[in-house]
Amino acid sequence: MKAALIVAVNFLLGSVPWAVMVGRVLRGVDITIYGDHNPGTYNALRAGGLRLAAPAMILEFAKGFVAGRLAQGMLTANPATASWAWAVAAAAPVAGHGFTPFLRFRGGKALAVTLGVWTAVAGWPAMLAYAGTLCLQELTWPKAPDAFKVSLGMVVLGSVAWLMRLPARYALAWALTFAVILIKQWQYETVFQCTTDRYGAGINDNRPRTGSRGA
């Protein structure tokens, strides 16, 4: 029962669209009318530069970190917690962000929240592996497909977790998280791309699209 409660709480924590809220509060803009309509940190950057992106990133990271600590708390309270229950609790905030009910289940790609969760459950090596891989690709191969970049980031993260000899439950949490991220990448590059194309602008266009569906 307690495990189910933590899974539900973590899903709700992840579903809070902080980047969208930051855009509305600090600049009065809907960041989902920019770029690929993703309600995440990258479109906050497109909509208002670092003034929006920095607080959005901090808050999105923080919700993942808090959820990750709650998942770890399950083990502290009951070391016999089933591996699958812990893994679901760790992946729940990522799913919450990707399928948030506050935005009609059209959430973001969950990169920042994933970073927060894995920093909480695996420490700074995991954070540096994931964030470092994404940043390095942006610097060296910025035009690479997003799906490739995030997939490589997750592969490096999983490799570091394996090198750290983390318990098997981490592999399950990693697989669940990776599955959510891949689904979101597929949606934004195929399903949601159809919406973008109707307004005559590419998925990487920074201009707001009049008539597009906001959050």
Model-derived regions: residue spans:
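Helix-coil boundary and interhelical linker segments in multi-pass alpha-helical membrane proteins
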Residues: M1-I6, V66-V88, T119-A126, A161-A173
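N-terminal signal-anchor transmembrane alpha helix
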Residues: K2-R27
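Cytosolic, membrane-interface loops and tails of multi-pass inner-membrane proteins
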Residues: V20-A53, G107, E189-A215
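Short, non-helical or kinked segments that cap or interrupt transmembrane helices
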Residues: V29-G40, P101-L115, K143-G153
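Interfacial segments of multi-pass membrane proteins
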Residues: L45-G48, A71-M74, A92, L111-K143, ...
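Multi-pass membrane catalytic core of lipid/isoprenoid biosynthesis enzymes
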Residues: R46-Q72
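Loop-to-transmembrane alpha-helix initiation sites
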Residues: A126-A131, P145-G153, R165-F178
